[in-house]
């Protein structure tokens, strides 16, 4: 099986070997001829060659793009044929836009059985040539000689076509070197006229050729002149013709122009042959004229000069002169013409001519200067006669003559002097011109006036020359505008003064020629003194006259010399110093000088003429020098002056060349002067260059922006050569350095709101150039009122329209040159009234008047009225809401009638210390250390009791049983207000008591039985009685939150049927608890079914260690204090806003297993052992204590002591070690079950309560002043306005029945309810800012009165002393109630009576937002009394009893220091029974704790005198002896650590009051032992179902021996 395959393999191998031997000559194919790339035209045949060899002969196949090519072998109809040689032949190339089957890359493959061979790639491309040229050549137009370029881009094609050009249908000869074809561009470098023609671009490739569009080359010819104009010289009034002929292609246009100006209007014409003809040529027609030939290719110019030959005319004519014998005289003669005429002199009758270029002869006394002046020296009598001056040029000649008179004796008098000449003026048409000319001289000068060089004709009636020389022109016309010259002449010479006068049509006020105030013009300077003299220079000095006139700003120097003429010449001006060197004087000449001072207002009178001064003589020239030769050679010197170079605004550089030098050139004189019509023919200024080789110089100190004419002249000593030609140069401009003058602003008559602004240009020397424009700013008091105007430099007025009336505008004007605007003028103010008339400065109203005008505007009055109306409406709305809120509270009081346990006190807000103190609705302590915070009942409460004598009850007596008339009468049964005025005598400080009574009397006489607060079974004849029928002190009810009212109302209906049965067994004692009313009400509901009590419920408030105040940390809804009984007219400052917070949300959940509560039946106290009935009202300290061991005899001097209010508003400051004897009736909803437990006998045996921390609350405000030592009553019942005022007498029986029914109910002690302090957070806020239960007071007179009672209410007051409890007990005694006293036994076995104390709880309805909720508190059902005396049994409805609350964690608050030291003052503190009694009482209660709610009223037991560091020492501290009673002996207390931290929360225990021997620190947790108190209860059957509001439970009070002790309290 294995060998059989091997046979097969062997056989195959043999066959293979035998086959290879048979075909050894075969070889695989190879390509011999590869195909090549082809470019073929569409539709043309093509062949792709491919040749291969091999054995056997290989077969050839073609592939295109990787796919086999189909040939005729595959398809006979195919246009592709495979030739035998292997080549691929295309019959025609198929090529379309969408289908290109033949184009591509081909390969040929040769195969045989040995293999295959592949050729190279060969591409077959289809040649194309499109028809459209990518760029056709465009027409070109060039001038002869310019290059011409034609661009062409052939159409797209493959292969790329080549370009050639045709001209006029023939191929272009590119052999011409001027023609270049590159990249399709045809370029002809230098065109000729023969190159013009039509050109075509031709594109060619294998497909064919394409021709572009025809482009034409146009060759134009620039203009050229056939005949040019030539220079002409003609005389004046002749005609001048300039010929001009030009050619070009196209034919050029020909025009003429004058290089330096315009062609003379109406005197020239251009003929058809382009010839320019000027008729009546004038001298102004001289210049260069240019013929301009221009066509579309270019232009050509040809110029010619016209010279106008002007006959000479005299500029200065000689005048007759009188000269003394032997003197020198000069005749001036100056002429101009074109060319410059020659001047020569001759004496009439003589043929001898004297020329200016003639050298002077030493023997001759006659000479002619270069300027043409004839000078005769050493005049002789034979020189008398006429002398003729003649001028001559090619245009003509003129002559003039002057007479010389020679006298024997003649003074060398100067010419006259013009003291005051005319000034430039601008007047309105029909105005009057006054031109003054005051001249002095000897003899008196003759004054002549010329206008523009022509004598003014006086034949015109408008023109008159006065004798003084003044020229007066009335009714000025526009034609009177011109330059006026005053000439003053005498035989010795003349003086001239010119001014320019302009007459305008409108708006130019008449200006006086000189300022009317002479102090504005400088006075004449002093006589000039000569300090230095040279050949050509004289130096002068002078002093200004500062005694009168204004201070000069510059000076003008004038000089006179007979050698220079017969008139005064201005030698220098604008001289800034008092010393000046005058240059350019003639040698060997006598000169006189005078000086004038000048400022902006004018020129002063001339100074005195200086002494004559003679310049030095010319130094003699070298010997042998011929003067004639010097003059001749200087005359042949020719200077060529170049165009000056402008260097700056005040300097110019001048260059010149000398054509022919001379040895007699000593230097050059550069003469320059301002040119232009405005400057006139001013004198030439000379700048000498004494270096002959120098050919340039810089002329300094030129005026800015002025056009100067400059020329040069060679000189040699006194000899001078010919002048060069004149050149012009203009210095650079600068902004004017002075403002325009005489700026005026006036009302424009044409427009009601337009003004006219006029001005004069700045002084010429300050213009610093040509004024091109004036800028006018009209600025209002706001940007939107600004108006700017710009006018040209020749305009001196502008109208500014559209001014806003009432706006004060300031107008400023500034001149502007090419360098910019210059200095602004002084602002001119104008204001238009509502009628468009200018308001004078006197008429401009003051600011107060403007305000008054605004106030009188109807719109303003309407706006004020609308604002007042809005304010009134807002106030009305606020008042309505305020009253509505009060009415809402009043309507809520109606519910108080239904619930006897509700008490509410409206408030009056006072302002004390700059802050709001609200007494309404803010429960808290009454701090005697804070003055002026006592709340008052607003007198707006109606007093319905008309007979106060019947029912008024005076709380306190003055110690003798008489009522104090200074106190307000109260009429609330069983309530007492202590009169402390008689107790303090000299201890009342800072009292802010009102002058009159502010209490409202509430009349309860008509319907006392309807007063639900008193409608209890124990109410009899208007007095409260206990079950045994004895009158009992009234215990007020307590406020609760508004959110409890609904629950109370709902549970009132069935309250009588639901009885709570306390457990009979006694339960172990637990730690005292403390909580606030919110926690109590909230938590008791949850634990109503549970019979256990949490150990501690902290108060939700924090304590201030400085003030003893407490901070309220709850946020309860209440109404504002401002809505509760404000007194009319009382100012209620706004209380500071405090952020509200709902602190109830922060309370933790109750514990799962609260501790059990005490058995209330353990509470046993005799009601019979009560206070004595006669007790004077004590002075309440703050905090007030009830001291034990007071003498019984003190009770006889006191009035009834009201029950102690709840003083313990801060848990950290109070420890309750005595149980209160006040039995207060809580409502079912606020069953204070945890509070009805006994405190330990002594807190010293009680371990420290756990450290509690309080939540920080808002910081307290600054401390308040000390309160006065008066405590005012608080009404604890419904308002009189809410009661029926007509209670009948017949309802007394019903009251008796109710009293009988209530005897079966047990009296429950009111639980201690901590009052949340206000959000202000200090003690004052918890005292005056709280609404607390008030106390009424009963006087002895009311014991026998009817049931009527007048109820007075005071808001926010609070008793903080134990005397308040004594007052209540005394009131109960007065009312016929038997007050029980508890007999105690101390440690030594001694028995004594201990007065029961129970501080009145504070109100729970104060909130952080200073709101007081009106809460209807339901009466707690009276408890059934057991048979054993002294014990109380609780009887309540199961559904209404709340479970004990869970104690939340204590919240710690930061201690806030008081900002002011409170006043130290003595206070009256009642003494309590001895400590032994308390010890004994504590020992009696060790067996169990009381479960009753008798101890719910707490009191703060603090004494500011106590040292907080050692409570035991504080206990042993003796009385200071200031009390009225006898001090009790000191007793030792069991040692106990009773101090708690100031921030600790103390457990609740029934409060008592420390003795004077045992004061307590406010921060200490009191170590006093607690003492229970009970009420004597009698069993009463037939307890029916009653309204909860009618169930009042009265508390019994024990008698106690108490004394008042005066304590000093210090608060820091």
Swiss-Prot record:
Regions of this protein lying in the Extracellular compartment: 20-858
Extent of the signal sequence: 1-19
Keyword set, alphabetical order: Cell membrane, Cell projection, Chemotaxis, Developmental protein, Differentiation, Disulfide bond, Glycoprotein, Immunoglobulin domain, Membrane, Neurogenesis, Phosphoprotein, Receptor, Repeat, Signal, Transmembrane, Transmembrane helix, Ubl conjugation
Membrane-side (Cytoplasmic) residue stretches: 880-1612
Domain of life assignment: Eukaryota
Locations listed in the record: Cell membrane; Cell projection, Axon; Endoplasmic reticulum-Golgi intermediate compartment membrane
Predominant subcellular localization, coarse grouping: membrane
Residues found modified as Phosphothreonine: 909, 1201
TM ranges: 859-879
GO molecular function, one term: axon guidance receptor activity
Residue ranges, compositional bias (Basic residues): 1420-1431
Sequence ranges of Pro residues compositional bias: 1147-1157, 1257-1268, 1441-1451
Phosphoserine: modified positions: 901, 1016, 1258
Residue ranges with Low complexity bias: 1108-1124, 1345-1358, 1563-1575
Record field: compositional bias (Polar residues): 1098-1107, 1216-1230, 1399-1412, 1553-1562
Residue stretches making up the Ig-like C2-type domain: 29-125, 131-218, 223-307, 312-407, 416-502
Assembly and oligomerization: Homodimer. Dimerization is mediated by the extracellular domain and is independent of SLIT liganding. Interacts with SLIT1 Interacts with SLIT2. Interacts with FLRT3. Interacts with MYO9B (via Rho-GAP domain).
Name of the protein described by the UniProt record: Roundabout homolog 1
Originating species: Mus musculus
């Amino acid at each position: 099986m294995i060998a059989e395959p091997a046979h097969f393999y062997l056989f195959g191998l043999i066959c293979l070997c035998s086959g290879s031997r048979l075909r050894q000559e075969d070889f695989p194919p190879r390509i011999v001829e590869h195909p090549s790339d082809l470019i073929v035209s569409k539709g043309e045949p093509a062949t792709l060659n491919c040749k291969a060899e091999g054995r056997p002969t290989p077969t050839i196949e073609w592939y295109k793009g990787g796919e086999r090519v189909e040939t005729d072998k595959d398809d006979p109809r195919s246009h592709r044929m495979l030739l035998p040689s292997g080549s691929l032949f295309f019959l025609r190339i198929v090529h379309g836009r969408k289908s290109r089957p033949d184009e591509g890359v081909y390969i040929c493959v040769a195969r045989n059985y040995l293999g295959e061979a592949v050729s190279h790639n060969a591409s077959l491309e289809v040649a194309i040539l499109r028809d459209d040229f990518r760029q056709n050549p465009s027409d070109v137009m060039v001038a002869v000689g310019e290059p011409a370029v034609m661009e062409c881009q052939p159409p797209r094609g493959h292969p790329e076509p080549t370009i050639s050009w045709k001209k006029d249908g023939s191929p272009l000869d590119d052999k011409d070197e001027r023609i270049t074809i590159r990249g399709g561009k045809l370029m002809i470098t230098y065109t000729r006229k023969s190159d013009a023609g039509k050109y075509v671009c031709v594109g060619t490739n294998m497909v064919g050729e394409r021709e572009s569009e025809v482009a034409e080359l146009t060759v134009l010819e620039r203009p050229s002149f056939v005949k040019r104009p030539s220079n002409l010289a003609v005389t004046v009034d002749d005609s001048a013709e300039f010929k001009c002929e030009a050619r070009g292609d196209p034919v050029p246009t020909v025009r003429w122009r004058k290089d330096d100006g315009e062609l003379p209007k109406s005197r020239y014409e251009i003929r058809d042959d382009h010839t320019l003809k000027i008729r009546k040529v004038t001298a102004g027609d001289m210049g260069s004229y240019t013929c301009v030939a221009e066509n579309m290719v270019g232009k050509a110019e040809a110029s010619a000069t016209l010279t106008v030959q002007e006959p000479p005319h005299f500029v200065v004519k000689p005048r007759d002169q009188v000269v003394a014998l032997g003197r020198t005289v000069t005749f001036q003669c100056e002429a101009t013409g074109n060319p410059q005429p020659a001047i020569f002199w001759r004496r009439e009758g003589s043929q001898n001519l004297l020329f200016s270029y003639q050298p002077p002869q030493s023997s001759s006394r006659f000479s002619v200067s270069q300027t043409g002046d004839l000078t005769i020296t050493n005049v002789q009598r034979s020189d008398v006669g006429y002398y003729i001056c003649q001028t001559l040029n090619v245009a003509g000649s003129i002559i003039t003559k002057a007479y010389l008179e020679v006298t024997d004796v003649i003074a060398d008098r100067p010419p006259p002097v013009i003291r005051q000449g005319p000034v430039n003026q601008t007047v309105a048409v029909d105005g009057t011109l006054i031109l003054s000319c005051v001249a002095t001289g000897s003899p008196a000068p003759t004054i002549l006036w010329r206008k523009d060089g022509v004598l003014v004709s006086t034949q015109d009636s408008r023109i008159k020359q006065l004798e003084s020389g003044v020229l007066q022109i009335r009714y000025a016309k526009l034609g009177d505008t011109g330059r006026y010259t005053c000439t003053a002449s005498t035989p010795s010479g003349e003086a001239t003064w010119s001014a320019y006068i302009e007459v305008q049509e409108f708006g130019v006020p008449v200006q006086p020629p000189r300022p009317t105030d002479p102090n504005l013009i400088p006075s004449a300077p002093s006589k000039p003194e000569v300090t230095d003299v040279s050949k050509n220079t004289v130096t002068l000095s002078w002093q200004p006259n500062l005694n009168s006139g204004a201070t000069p700003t510059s000076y003008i120097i004038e000089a006179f010399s007979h050698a220079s003429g017969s008139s005064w010449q201005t030698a220098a001006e604008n001289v800034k110093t008092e010393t000046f060197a005058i240059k350019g004087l003639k040698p060997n000449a006598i000169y006189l000088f005078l000086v004038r001072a000048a400022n902006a207002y004018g020129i002063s009178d001339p100074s005195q003429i200086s002494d004559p001064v003679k310049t030095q003589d010319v130094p003699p020239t070298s010997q042998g020098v011929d003067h004639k030769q010097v003059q001749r050679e200087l005359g042949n010197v020719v200077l060529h002056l170049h165009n000056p170079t402008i260097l700056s605004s005040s300097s110019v550089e001048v260059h010149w060349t000398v054509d022919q030098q001379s040895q007699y050139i000593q230097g050059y004189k550069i003469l320059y002067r301002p040119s232009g019509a405005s400057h006139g023919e001013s004198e030439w200024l000379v700048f000498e260059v004494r270096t002959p080789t120098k050919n340039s110089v810089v002329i300094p100190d030129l005026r800015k922006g002025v056009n100067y004419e400059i020329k040069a002249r060679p000189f040699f000593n006194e000899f001078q050569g010919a002048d060069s030609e004149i050149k012009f140069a203009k210095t650079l401009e600068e902004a004017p350095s002075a403002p325009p003058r005489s700026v005026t602003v006036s009302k424009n008559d044409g427009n009601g709101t337009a003004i006219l602004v006029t001005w004069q240009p700045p002084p010429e020397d300050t213009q610093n150039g040509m004024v091109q424009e004036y800028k006018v700013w009209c600025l209002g008091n706001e940007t939107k009122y600004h108006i700017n105007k710009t006018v040209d430099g020749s305009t001196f007025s502008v109208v500014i329209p559209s001014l806003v009336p009432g706006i004060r505008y300031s107008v400023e004007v500034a001149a502007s040159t090419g360098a910019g605007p210059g200095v602004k003028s002084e602002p001119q103010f104008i204001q238009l009234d509502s009628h468009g008339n200018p308001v004078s400065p006197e008429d401009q109203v003051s600011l107060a008047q403007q305000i008054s005008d605004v106030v009188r505007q109807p719109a303003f009055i309407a706006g004020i009225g609308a604002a007042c109306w809005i304010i009134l409406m807002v106030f009305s709305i606020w008042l309505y809401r305020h009253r509505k809120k009060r009415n809402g509270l009043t309507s809520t009081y109606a519910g108080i009638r239904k619930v006897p346990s509700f008490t509410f006190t409206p408030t009056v807000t006072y302002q004390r210390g700059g802050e709001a103190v609200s007494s309404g609705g803010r429960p808290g302590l009454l701090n005697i250390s804070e003055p002026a915070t006592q709340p008052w009942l607003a007198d707006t409460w109606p007093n319905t009791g008309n007979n106060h004598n019947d029912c008024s009850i005076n709380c306190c007596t003055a110690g003798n049983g008489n009522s104090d008339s200074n106190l307000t009468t109260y009429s609330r049964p069983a309530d007492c207000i202590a009169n402390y005025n008689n107790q303090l005598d000299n201890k009342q400080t800072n009292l802010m008591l009102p002058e009159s009574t502010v209490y409202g009397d509430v009349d309860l006489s008509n319907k006392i039985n309807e007063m639900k607060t008193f409608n209890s079974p124990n109410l009899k004849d208007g007095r409260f009685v206990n079950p045994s029928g004895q009158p009992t002190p009234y215990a007020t009810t307590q406020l609760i939150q508004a959110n409890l009212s609904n629950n109370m109302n709902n549970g009132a209906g069935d309250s009588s049927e639901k009885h709570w049965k306390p457990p009979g067994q006694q339960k172990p004692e637990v730690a005292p608890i403390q909580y606030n009313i919110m926690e109590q009400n909230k938590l008791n509901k949850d634990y109503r079914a549970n019979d256990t009590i949490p150990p501690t419920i902290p108060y939700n408030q924090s304590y201030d260690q400085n003030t003893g105040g407490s901070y309220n940390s709850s946020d309860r809804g209440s109404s504002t204090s401002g809505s509760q009984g404000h007194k009319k007219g009382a100012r209620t400052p706004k209380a500071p806003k405090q952020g509200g917070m709902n602190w109830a949300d922060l309370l933790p959940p109750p514990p799962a297993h609260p501790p059990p509560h005490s058995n209330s039946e353990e509470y046993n106290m005799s009601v019979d052992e009560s206070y004595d009935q006669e007790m004077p009202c004590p002075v309440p300290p703050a905090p007030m204590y009830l001291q034990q061991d007071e003498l019984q005899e003190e009770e006889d001097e006191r009035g009834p002591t009201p029950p102690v209010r709840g003083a313990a508003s801060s848990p950290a400051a109070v420890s309750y070690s005595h149980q209160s004897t006040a039995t207060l009736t809580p409502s079912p909803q606020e069953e204070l079950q945890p509070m009805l437990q006994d405190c330990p006998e002594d807190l010293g045996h009680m371990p420290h309560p756990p450290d509690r921390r309080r939540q920080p609350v808002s910081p307290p405000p600054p401390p308040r002043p000390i309160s006065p030592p008066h405590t005012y009553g608080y009404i604890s019942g419904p308002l009189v306005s809410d009661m029926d005022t007509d209670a009948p007498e017949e309802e007394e029986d019903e009251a008796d029945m109710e009293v009988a029914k209530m005897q079966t109910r047990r009296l429950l002690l009111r639980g201690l309810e901590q009052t949340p302090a206000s959000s202000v957070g200090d003690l004052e806020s918890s005292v005056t800012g709280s609404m607390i239960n008030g106390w009424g007071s009963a006087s002895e007179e009311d014991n026998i009165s009817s049931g009527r009672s007048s109820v007075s209410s005071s808001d926010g007051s609070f008793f903080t002393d134990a005397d308040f409890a004594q007052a209540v007990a005394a009131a109960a005694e007065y009312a016929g109630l038997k007050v029980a006293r508890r007999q105690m036994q101390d440690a030594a076995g001694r028995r004594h009576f201990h007065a029961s104390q129970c501080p009145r709880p504070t109100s729970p309805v104060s909130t952080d937002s200073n709101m007081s909720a009106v809460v209807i508190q339901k009466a707690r059902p009276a408890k059934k009394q057991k048979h054993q005396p002294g014990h109380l049994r609780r009887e309540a409805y199961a559904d209404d009893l709340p479970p004990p609350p869970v104690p939340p964690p204590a919240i710690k608050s930061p201690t806030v220091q008081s900002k002011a030291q409170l006043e130290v003052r003595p206070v009256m503190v009642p003494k309590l029974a001895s400590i032994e009694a308390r010890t004994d009482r504590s020992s009696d209660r060790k067996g169990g704790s009381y479960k009753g709610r008798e101890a719910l009223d707490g009191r703060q037991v603090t004494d500011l005198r106590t040292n907080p560091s050692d409570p035991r020492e504080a206990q042993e501290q003796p009385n200071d002896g200031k009390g009225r009673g006898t001090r009790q002996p000191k007793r030792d207390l069991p040692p106990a650590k009773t101090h708690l931290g100031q921030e600790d929360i103390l457990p609740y225990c029934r409060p008592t009051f420390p003795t004077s021997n045992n004061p307590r620190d406010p921060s200490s947790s009191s170590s006093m032992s607690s003492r229970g108190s009970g009420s004597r209860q009698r069993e009463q059957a037939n307890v029916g179902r009653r309204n909860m509001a009618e169930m009042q439970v009265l508390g019994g009070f024990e008698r106690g021996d108490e004394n008042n002790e005066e304590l000093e309290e210090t608060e820091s």
